[in-house]
Amino acid sequence: MRSLFSSKLSRAPASPPPPPPHAAAGGGGDAHTPSSHGHRHRRFPKENVDPSPSPGPYDHHSAYRSPSGKQQQQQPLAAKNRSLPPRPPLKRKLLDVSAASPAPEGAPSGGGGGDSGVQVVVRVRPPSRAEEEDEGAGKEVCVRKTGPGSVEIHGQGFTFDSVADEASTQEDIFQLVGRPLVENCLDGFNSSIFAYGQTGSGKTYTMWGPLSALSDDTVSKERGLTPRVFELLFSRIKEEQAKHSNKQLVYHCCCSFLEIYNEQITDLLDPVQRNLQIREDVGTSSVYVESLTKESVFTINDVTQLLEKGLANRRTEATTANAESSRSHCVFTCFIKSESKNMEDGSNFTRTSRINLVDLAGSERQKLTNAAGDRLKEAGNINRSLSQLGNLINILAEVSQSGKQRHHIPYRDSKLTFLLQESLGGNAKLAMICAVSPSQNCKSETLSTLRFAHRAKDIKNNAVVNEQREDDVNVLREQIRQLKEELQHVRSNGSLPGSNGSPSTGWNSQNSFLLKMSLSRPTAFPTIKDDSDEEMEIDDNDVEKPCNLENKSSFPHGDVETSRCKSNLAASIQKGLQVIESHRNSVTWRRSSLGLNTRLMDAHLSVPVCKVDVAIQTDPEESEPRQNTMALIPSNQPEATTDGNREISDCINLQLVTVDGSIPSNDLKQQEQVFKAVEKVLAGAIRREMLRDEQCAKQAAEIQQLKRLVQQYKHERECNAAIAQIREEKIARLETLVDGILPTEELMHAENLSLQDENKILHQKYENHPEVLSAKIELERIQEELERYRNFKDEKEVLLEEIQHLKNQLHYMLSSSMALCRPPVELVQAISTVSDRPTISALEEAGDDGHSIVDAAESRWITLTEELRVELEKSKSLSERLQLEVESEKQCSEELKGALEMAMQGHARILEQYCELQEKHASLLSMCRTINDGIEDVKKEAAKAGVRGAESKFINALARQVSILRAEREKERRFWMDENKGLQQQLSDTAEAVQAAGELLVRLNDAEEAASLAQKRAELAEQEMNKAFAEIDNLKRDHDQEVLVLNQRLAESKLPSNVVQSPEPSETGPARYDTGGSFGDEQWREEFKPFQSVEVSKSSDPSSWFYGYDKCNI
């Protein structure tokens, strides 16, 4: 491969060949140059339609932007187009990352995060010597570069971001792909480069270059993309560190190198680790390879050593298509982490990025490479992995074009797509280098690669800057400490005056800052109807009131400082009142919007406003006197009225003035009125704010409803656009049918397919309609509720049965417990005998004998109680002993069960061993029989030969060996017979497959020839159509000229000169005209008759072509 790119550079043309005359400027081979006369557009194939919109005023040049939109915009529209207007292309949704996180000053504009497309670069390798010898020097290549970003293969054009022809060098590829990748990584974006193509197309050479170029001490021109990228990366890191040395900028880089061989991951830096597993990090939602070696790198030499080590361990084999064919996908990954610190606020910035350099194994056909054995197995795994990658790219391109998200994207179908899922449609910028071969033998693989690249161009990634900010804990602690000190200082100076009688400077600065913030933040409220400030209840305990204290001292600085403070304060408040008055007169004030937007003239106010919380206010007589207090005194006393605007105006007229001395009672009354007015204003403001929140909630609900409607309209627009496209294709087919190009059978088949597509679209539109979806959701909810009710009904019956069963059990237990609680018969009899005591009257009659009877009864009760206690103890001990026996029996039963299971398992094992031994015994018996038979045969032969004595023992031993060898040979013969049958079956299957492939190849050749013939016929028909259109235009032009001439003659012949001088008619006779006038009239009518006949013949003759054209239009 090195010889291809190095030896052919001198012989390759310096500039690409000019495009053919039928090729468009930038659209590929299918677009024809539009002429000045009107003709119909030729429709492009679907696979080469650029989904990107035409450039707008916001488009800018980017390395990841496809120029196809601009080239298609430059094509002029046709003069006549009888079809429907074309469907507008789908717009790419670009994520503007640069606005959220600006790039450094030195970063170029091309590497910004505003473009989320995929950069696709096609590189055409020079033809090899073998290809030149086989195809001949004069034979043309299959692929040709027609422009800076377009190629053509067999009349079919493709448009990409860049196209590198045979004369391109490694430096050109680096400038196209490598340099933007380095800038993106330094800006914090993840970046990836894929090298895709068939085997032997130059992917490995483009990515790594030859190993000799890596090991050379001098800089070689054949170095690949990877060493050039890291050389620029380390130089840019040094520049950034020198440029931002004040920010303590530090970079850390570590690299890993792996390969995917037969769907198994191997660490190329440590080849002992094989079959590594891919794990997913739940915290960061990213994937990684477990136990993969990562080496820290600091210079380009470290990276070169890793590349040499990894590429030496990579699996490469020789095939007929390539002497060193890569048999695995390899991925070289570099993790870059930068840390910087902002010295102003102490915050730390951490920016991470990742570079993935992927060299995919080349797709190959067994027919061309003649692979067999391990090579065939490797080729099957490679083609399967690339097929899954192509399927994934098709799905991602479909999602990007349609804008509809899919529930499942098959990232896990292969190790390659699972490992690189972040680069495919995720948080990364992707560039793809598609290497193709110009040989005619590889035209199908080249076309497949170009189609793959064109589909990959439609993918949209969401690349964002990976940056985190962490505030310094020490700086935050210092700020908290300073704020606490300021708060403590404000509290101490706010309650006690200074030693010299002047107010605290820190308190004044803090107060002025808060006043500035409150005046510089206007608050706008919505329009409120029927507003009344008297409906809100105000708690007087939560309102701050000015204290009424006597002033016993004045400022020590005298009246000069007091007057200066007064003037500053009066000027600042006067300016604020002017701003408020202007807001009052404006529309915003009429809408009950309150706002204050002004600034104080002097930030260092030295006169405080005395405010004391009502909850901690004490008696003014008991408090200490304060100096130079200020009070809110109205300059004009407001009148009590219910008008809210009047109260607001009265509150605006309030002024802050200084008071040297005690405040009189009239002023206190005025202050109370002012505060009541302020309370009412605040109550109205609070109520308006609540109403504004309610209105905001309503508007948010309306916005959600409008968003749903917008989504519905978007879906309907897409469906309508698809239906319009189908109708346009139908019109085109009808035109081709009328022109005689398309047969009726093909038209009917195409109509059937289009109607099926339209039916699917309408069905999808119906299913995705919001009302239908809501109805479905409601139906599912009702069905679930009905199912729940049914289950509840079934459960109710079951529960009723269980309740009845439990009632029966309870009744049984109660009856049994009552039976158990009955005393034994002996105790009952004893109790009955005891209970048969004499009555009191009998005891009185008995006298002394009654006392003896009572004593005997008591003794019997005591003995009976003792007997019952003993019986109870015996029953308890008996129950405990029985319980222990039950537990022991349970343990014994469990042990017996375990022993029985073990015995059963042992018996099963013994049976299996017995069966195996029996089989072995049978085989040994058969072998022994064969050996004995052989021995008997040998003995018989020896007896016939007359052998006696010791020779017979030797013969017996030989006979045993011969019989053993016979048995082994019989086994081998049977094994090889089975193997032969299997191989014959495989051979027959392979022959059938080859025959089927041959038939398929013949059919494909026939189809290609038919397609080429149809294409030629279509071109001829289109040329004839253009000629017919030109003839139509010429005839129309001639017809217009003839009509103009006739109109001129009509205008000249309507008023002859001799008609004007006719004599007056007589009174008795009829009016007569001279012969000259009548002759002239008849003359121009006779002259006009042939033109009228010609025009009628033109318009009414069915055999004329113009009549058929009008009929076609109708």
UniProtKB/Swiss-Prot annotation:
Keywords of this protein's UniProt record, alphabetized? ATP-binding, Coiled coil, Microtubule, Motor protein, Nucleotide-binding
Give residue spans, biased composition: Low complexity: 98-107
Task: Provide the coiled-coil residue spans.
Answer: 772-810, 999-1043
User: Which terms does the record give in the GO molecular function aspect?
Assistant: ATP binding; ATP hydrolysis activity; microtubule binding; plus-end-directed microtubule motor activity
Q: Which residues bind ATP?
A: 197-204
One GO term of the cellular component aspect? microtubule
Region Disordered: start-end pairs: 1-119, 1055-1081
SUPFAM superfamilies, alphabetized: P-loop containing nucleoside triphosphate hydrolases
Instruction: Please give the SMART domains that the UniProt record associates with this protein.
Output: KISc
Ranges of residues in domain Kinesin motor: 117-459
Q: Which GO terms describe its biological process?
A: microtubule-based movement
Ranges of Polar residues composition bias in the record: 1055-1065
Concerning its family, UniProt says:
Belongs to the TRAFAC class myosin-kinesin ATPase superfamily. Kinesin family. KIN-12 subfamily.
The protein depicted here goes by the name Kinesin-like protein KIN-12B
Instruction: Write down the species.
Output: Oryza sativa subsp. japonica
Q: Which gene encodes it?
A: KIN12B
